[in-house]
């Protein structure tokens, strides 16, 4: 079968939180912006799709009261003045997405899902199942704010089981993957460690595929240098041993054959179509 290429894709900035740079790469005590990127792509038959959503005003509403307020204090967020993901897409000439792929359920990745009342949500089932069973305080500690999910979320959910994922070939033989559309245009990749059900994505684009590893690292320089994360950053990973194992697998891929991108990496932020916002 001939593989399908995605003719159009773009990163966008969906707001940011401000944190110590040291937490991401162990360098310096200054603060930097950790942009909440989302990614749009156009599939020839499925139309516009989205990966994550960034922040929106719904994040502020969800963190107005306690214990959710603690999350806002720990990760002080600033919304994009250009609007939420739905408004940003419209401004840049994109149709509303039919499907939104959720890499995981941390608030900076699902903060705008309520802005898309007709979209379907695709995710790894364990990513939500594990968090939904926790008390609210524990959910907040895990970075999950249940009020960010719209009413009727389950009616529009496409919850994928791990049994649908299989070992890839060649460079991907260490990864469990799913050819989502069945045409090799988009591969979902299980990248355990950072959060329950954490996913990355391989997009078949020119001039070479993009491997969007979402939060498998926060800075590609840290990934390449193999510098350990500071202790506080290790403790907030869902499983730090799995996180390290995932990074090792990513480093073993031939870097000349793809373009790596990570959600909060300064390099990836410069690729955003609305970088100047």
What are the roles of these predicted feature ranges?
Residues 64-123:
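Active-site metal-binding motif and surrounding structural segment of the metallo-beta-lactamase
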Residues 4, 26-33, 123, 133-154, ...:
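C-terminal/domain-terminus segments
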Residues 11, 37-43, 49, 162-206:
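Core dinuclear metal-dependent hydrolase active-site scaffold
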Residues 53-55, 105, 194-195, 215-216, ...:
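Active-site metal-binding loops of divalent metal-dependent hydrolases
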Residues 1-76, 249, 255:
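Zn-dependent metallo-beta-lactamase
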